[in-house]
Amino acid sequence: LLAYIGENYRDKIGSYKIITNGTIEPSAELIEIMQKYHVAAEISDYTNGVPQLKEKIESVVETYRKNNIQTYFLSAARWVDFGFEDVQNNYTIEQARAFFDYCHTRCRGYVDGKIRYCINAFFAERTLYGTEDINNMLDVVNMENTEKSRRKLVEFDLGYNEKGFLLMCQHCNGTVEINQHFIEVGKQCQNR
């Protein structure tokens, strides 16, 4: 996907980057694609909450830097609690649509050949309920290189979907820009 976007749209993208927690060493193929299309790496620093990650993250940072990949090391003092297990908003359809539009998460994800509009909702729904909201996915593996497909991709990224919201909006406090429910980094599972 990174190569496809780079090949077809890189000249139209100002900032092109991946975000990682730095715990997985990038493959040679990923490094090559990032070099070719000038993809930067943002590595979230969770070492204050999870100090045992420090050595691994430093190794990943070094891999990116020695391969001339622009690398940003982001310190995060806290996370937000999306509330997926505990929140029951009981929104009407109109309220759910308004919440979805207000939230307008920018956190897309790519899993199993599909782009997920809200990657946090995808993982929570799959983990908690074993289901997947069709409004939270766009199959890009079988997507054709047509004007119609490109329009569909842009509309999906802008948040257009059949319902106007995602099912997990009923169980969510919202994305980082609107969420005021904070938790310490790496401490969200302290009772497990």
Indicate residue ranges for each PLM-predicted region.
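C-terminal accessory region of radical SAM enzymes
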Residues: 68-81, 120-180
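Core AdoMet radical
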Residues: 1, 9-26, 38-77
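Catalytic cores of alpha/beta
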Residues: 28-32
